[in-house]
């Protein structure tokens, strides 16, 4: 487990490789983040480092949040706090700055954020159901079809895919390639798209191995 960083999505653009290939990329303004808490196996039962990001006004923080930052000796007011599991928490100190220099070009990243909310959506848009016939007297155009059996079980099973609120949930896109790092402007240039709207908060971590290696 390795430390990540917090950032905000700036937008998408494209860059060109030395071979002349156009690469779609997302620009992320990441960090600098401040270490606001260090958790160890002895004190909390697990090892983790909490990072604070995005300076803000005092009115946007509760008294508990301001007290938490003051206890850590952090003078600036930070709006977003996130925790990252690490193997060696003793390698970090309270108030330490974490920048984009912890990453290197070519590295694979996992990027998590809140997906764009689409509001109430139907079966086709939300779950990609096929539609019914559009002519010959059909009245089943965009309906879901059967939602279960009859008297037995006499109910609709939980988890059945139906119309409802789409988007606005936490999404992680795995193994995105880091193309460039700009330490002077705190920018990460990531190949492909990342979740969320422009300006949305992102959690960026080194890619994790999920499942068994083949």
UniProtKB/Swiss-Prot annotation:
Is the keyword ATP-binding assigned to this protein?
Answer: no
Task: Provide the residue span(s) of the region labelled Disordered.
Answer: 129-155
What domain of life does the UniProt record list for this protein's source?
A: Bacteria
Q: Which UniProt keywords apply?
A: Ribonucleoprotein, Ribosomal protein, RNA-binding, rRNA-binding
Coiled coil spans: none
BP-aspect Gene Ontology terms? translation
Q: MF terms per GO, please?
A: rRNA binding; structural constituent of ribosome
Which SUPFAM superfamilies would you find in this protein's record?
Answer: Translation proteins
Task: Output a single Gene Ontology CC term carried by this record.
Answer: cytosolic large ribosomal subunit
> Which family does this protein fall into?
Belongs to the universal ribosomal protein uL3 family.
Q: What does this protein do?
A: One of the primary rRNA binding proteins, it binds directly near the 3'-end of the 23S rRNA, where it nucleates assembly of the 50S subunit.
Quaternary arrangement and interactors, per the entry? Part of the 50S ribosomal subunit. Forms a cluster with proteins L14 and L19.
* Protein name, UniProt field: Large ribosomal subunit protein uL3
* Organism for this UniProt entry: Synechococcus sp. (strain JA-3-3Ab)
Gene it is expressed from: rplC
């Amino acid at each position: 487990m390795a430390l990540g960083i917090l950032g905000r999505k700036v937008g998408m653009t494209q860059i060109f490789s030395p071979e002349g290939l156009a690469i779609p990329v997302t620009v992320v303004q990441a960090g600098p983040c401040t270490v606001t808490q260090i958790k160890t196996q002895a004190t909390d039962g697990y090892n983790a480092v909490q990072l604070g990001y995005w300076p803000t006004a005092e009115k946007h923080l509760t008294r508990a949040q301001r007290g938490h930052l003051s206890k850590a000796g952090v003078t600036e007011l930070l709006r977003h706090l996130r925790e990252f599991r690490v193997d060696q928490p003793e390698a970090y100190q309270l108030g330490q700055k974490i920048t984009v220099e912890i990453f290197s070009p070519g590295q694979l990243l996992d990027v998590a954020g809140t997906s764009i909310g689409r509001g109430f959506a139907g079966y086709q848009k939300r779950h990609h159901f096929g539609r019914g016939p559009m002519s010959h007297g059909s009245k089943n155009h965009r309906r879901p079809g059967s939602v279960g059996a009859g008297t037995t079980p006499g109910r609709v099973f939980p988890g059945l895919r139906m119309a409802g609120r789409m988007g606005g949930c936490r999404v992680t896109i795995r193994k995105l390639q880091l193309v460039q790092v700009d330490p002077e402007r705190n920018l990460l240039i990531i190949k492909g798209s990342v979740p969320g709207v422009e300006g949305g908060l992102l959690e960026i971590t080194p890619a994790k191995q999920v499942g068994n290696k083949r």
